[in-house]
Amino acid sequence: MRISKKKNTNLNRRTAQRESYDLVLIVCEGQETEPNYLESLREHEDLSSVNVVITGESHSDPISVVNHAIKIYEERANEKNPSTLFDKVYCLIDRDEHAKFDAAVHKANTYTYKAKRNILTIVRSYPCFEYWYLCHFKYSRAGIHKIGSKTAGDACTSLLNPLWQTIFGTKYTKNQSNVYPKLAHLIQIALTNSKRALQDTESSSDMNPSTEVHLLVEYLLNIKNSPTKK
């Protein structure tokens, strides 16, 4: 399910059932781009909205994402019901120009260390989530930086737009829905390019551009094979 401040009137979500695989919480920095993509993946791959909970209600700041993830996780933990406790919690954050990016990563790592179990997983994108989309069309490790009044994230979107328009005939917008099924035929290309870019960061020591989104996507594509408690 998607956690929202608004009342959910969707019948399918109200009647969704817990399935016998991991319970996972995904907290997104954006309110539209990442949740829209992940919700369309969940629906396309027929994953339960009870098992895969997605929220974009954390405000557009990496440290807020981590704080919100901890809050939701601890609310579940306080229920003292092992069957409803999240097995994994993912925090999606963009590097872009966020001043508290490193602080968010540090807080997540510290929380996990103190808990003595692997609770929070940070999924970083440099400069932004749209680089994951770019990986569906081509491999590129050319740095994506601020240009004039454009943020690095805006610059990444500008690189994505002509490729998007060639395939789909329309400009890319952050609030597009059903993105995953549109790109599904290119998913193996995206996984290959994203892995290659992340591997290259190890030798170049430059994270821009790269993303860890493929780690989350592969996990979700294989989640039905995960052994868990009922």
Could you describe each region identified by the protein language model?
Residues M1-S4, I63-V65:
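Membrane-interacting alpha-helical segments
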Residues G30, E34, S58-A69, N208-E212:
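Phosphate/oxyanion-binding active-site loops and adjacent basic polyanion-contact surfaces
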Residues R2-S4, T9-L23, N36-G56, E75-Y90, ...:
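C-terminal accessory helical subdomains adjacent to catalytic cores in phosphodiester-
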Residues Y21-Q31:
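N-terminal "first-domain core" detector
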